[in-house]
């Protein structure tokens, strides 16, 4: 059975672990526990063939900047996550996360993933953002950044409601299985 390695990166507390737990167990975790490194595996059928989707969760906190890239070799696709209600996590996609993964894995495809879309219209969240003269990140802003950074696609989801959740992983699988351009190897390699 072929394995697809999918590594999830992004700032701390944007919902990476919730995304993975909600997708793999259909349950939303009740408490926040910062991740150091975790992985999950699910079997998916694609065109009648079984694949193992290996999901690697990483720590977004700066303390783990040197440890995190150890999970990058052999990655088939990255999910670069930000919270649609955290403009700083959106900024860090461009400032930190895409530069980091492209430094280590130049040719590996990645999706830009907007998380926590259930909070986009929540009154208390909007008020908190307004105090700092901020607004939630829009679908259009996500799509624009994805194009600018050459992501395969921009997708959004809520791990809480599961809206768009399956689509995130379907798109990740498609990105990993896309036939590579003949001259390029697309798996992440460390030299």
Curated annotation (Swiss-Prot):
Subcellular compartments: Cell junction, Adherens junction; Cell membrane
UniProt entry keywords in alphabetical sequence: Cell junction, Cell membrane, Developmental protein, GTP-binding, Lipoprotein, Membrane, Methylation, Nucleotide-binding, Prenylation
Matching SUPFAM superfamilies: P-loop containing nucleoside triphosphate hydrolases
Positions occupied by motif Effector region: 32-40
Gene Ontology BP terms: ameboidal-type cell migration; anatomical structure morphogenesis; cellular process involved in reproduction in multicellular organism; developmental process involved in reproduction; hemocyte migration; maintenance of protein location; melanization defense response; positive regulation of cellular component organization
Topology of this chain in the membrane: Lipid-anchor
Pfam families: Ras (PF00071)
Sequence positions that bind GTP: 10-17, 57-61, 115-118
Lipid attachment points (S-geranylgeranyl cysteine): 188
Pro-peptide positions on chain: 189-191
Keyword RNA-binding: no
GO MF annotations in UniProt: GTP binding; GTPase activity
InterPro entries: Cdc42, P-loop_NTPase, Small_GTP-bd, Small_GTPase, Small_GTPase_Rho
UniProt keyword Repressor present: no
Residue(s) carrying Cysteine methyl ester: 188
GO cellular component: adherens junction; cytoplasm; plasma membrane
Family stated for the protein in its record: Belongs to the small GTPase superfamily. Rho family. CDC42 subfamily.
Function description: Regulates mbt kinase activity and is also required to recruit mbt to adherens junctions. Together with mbt, regulates photoreceptor cell morphogenesis.
Name assigned to this protein: Cdc42 homolog
Source species taxonomy: Eukaryota, Metazoa, Ecdysozoa, Arthropoda, Hexapoda
Encoding gene per record: Cdc42
């Amino acid at each position: 059975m072929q394995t697809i390695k999918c590594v999830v990166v992004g700032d701390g507390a944007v919902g990476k672990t919730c995304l993975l737990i909600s997708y793999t167990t259909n349950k939303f975790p009740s408490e926040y526990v910062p991740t150091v490194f975790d992985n999950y595996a699910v079997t998916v059928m694609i065109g009648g063939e079984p694949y193992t989707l290996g999901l690697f969760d990483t720590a977004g906190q700066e303390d783990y900047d040197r440890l995190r890239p150890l999970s990058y070799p052999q990655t088939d696709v990255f999910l670069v996550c930000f919270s649609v209600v955290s403009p700083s996590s959106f900024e860090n996609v461009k400032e930190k996360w895409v530069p980091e993964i492209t430094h280590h894995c130049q040719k590996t495809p990645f999706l830009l993933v907007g998380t926590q879309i259930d909070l986009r219209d929540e009154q208390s969240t909007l008020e908190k953002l307004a105090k700092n003269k901020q607004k939630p990140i829009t679908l259009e802003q996500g799509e624009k950044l994805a194009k600018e950074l050459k992501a395969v696609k921009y997708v959004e989801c809520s791990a809480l409601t599961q809206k768009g959740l399956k689509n995130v992983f379907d798109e990740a699988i498609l990105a990993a299985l896309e036939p590579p351009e003949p001259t390029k190897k697309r798996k992440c390699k460390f030299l």
